[in-house]
Amino acid sequence: MTDITTTRIDHTAKAFDTDLQEITRKVAEMGGLVERQIADSVQALVDRDVELGERVIALDPTIDALQREVEDKCILTIARRQPMAVDLRECVGAMRVCNDLERIGDHAKHIGKRVVALDDDFYPQKLIRGVEHMSALVLAQLKQVLDAYASRDLQSALAVWNGDEQVDSMCVSLFRELLTYMMEDPRNITFCMHLMFCAKDIERMGDHATNIAETVYYMVEGRPITDQRPKGDTTSFPAGVLQK
């Protein structure tokens, strides 16, 4: 191999590494914004903070823009550098992760919109506790899986993947609790229905965190997870919420 050829290979490798570093930085930035969006959306619900709910909604275009930036950068990198094997999986994986983060952000935005819509409605504080607990679990899972993505930690990613059933079970329990409150006092019906949709949004966030775990597995192992994803029993969900 000539010195010129070696120099070109080294230059290409360095350029690809630079591209990957930029992609990784943008994914991390997007992950941080989405984590904040989840926390703020639930806090807005707990505190009846319409202004915070509006800020959650206003953050969504920034997250969408980052998702497009990562996708464009990955496509350009693939076209320019023509990566193979693990390098190609890095680009494909980043696009997948950002797609799931964007969807999580959408679900947080939905909660923000419900906070704004509820405003001065009858708002029993005790009904929100289950949503708080569920969101704390999903937020912890998202943080764990993003750390797993950053460090390519397969075991940590699999722990999140296996934890999806816990989120589903918590959602079912919360639905049953809210149905009980609705039967006890008709004044609770409107607010409980809003909370059911919020809970379903949070459950969907957990599904997307599990998708990210599957992406980490694909990036590390070079193949998809073949086992069936653990899922809780959702037969008690009202049909309208399931279709959301």
How does the language model describe each region?
Residues 1-244:
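Cytosolic, long alpha-helical scaffolding segments
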